[in-house]
Amino acid sequence: MPEGHVIHRLARALDAQFGGETVQVSSPQGRFADSAALVDGHTLVTAQAWGKHLFVDFDAPVAEHLLHIHLGLIGKLGLAPLAAPVGVVRLRISDGEVAADLRGPQICRLVTEADREQVVARLGPDPIREDADPERAWQRIHRSAKPIASLLMDQQVSAGVGNIYRAEVLFRQHIKPSCPGNTLRRASFDAIWQDLVVLMRDGVEVGRIDTVTPEHSPEATGRTAREDAHGGEVYVYRRADLPCLVCGHRVRSALLEGRNLYWCGTCQRRH
């Protein structure tokens, strides 16, 4: 599932290409045709991301003028020069030159302002957004006995954080993944949050997740650069049984609530 920085990049791309423009909205697949017709031929006002949720605002004179998208595990949204649709395209937004095609989303629906407010109200603060309030995340974390590794993946705690950012921020802050939220020190939470802000906003800018500091980079250490579909240089994510880039001990992995968790038992001992 794409992490939050991907959704923010998509919002930026839609704004840059279509913002303020009259667009054609269609459903080549046909499944979204009735809803697409309601906003077809209207101006795309803006696109915004909250965590892993994308909302696209049209100036159509209907209550349900907001397009709500959640890509889920397999969904994809991409912009390309206008051409005949390829594959199963649920939704297409086009200005006649460029098309944004949506395939396989978990959510694709038109909603009202009130609907959007309900969705956003259920989400925790998004580290990428300027209006994020980390205190809301702290209040949920320090009242819970669940492991911090579980809590960070809870979208009601921190919106947009996924498996990669979860593993990497805990490593970078030396936090034991099994540390219960109600024993995590406030200083540790503050460090986690600030690091998420830096890492995730950097992900928006560069389009990939890079978490390794210069002294541990391939250039500095002479090691082979990472080759992975997710791009980016990371410390522990998908590095199970390989030596830790800092201490040399084996990176560990385990299933936690159905997702693979990666950590270094030597480097990550703090609470």
Predicted regions and their residues:
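Structured catalytic/nucleic-acid-binding cores of DNA maintenance enzymes
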Residues: 1-271
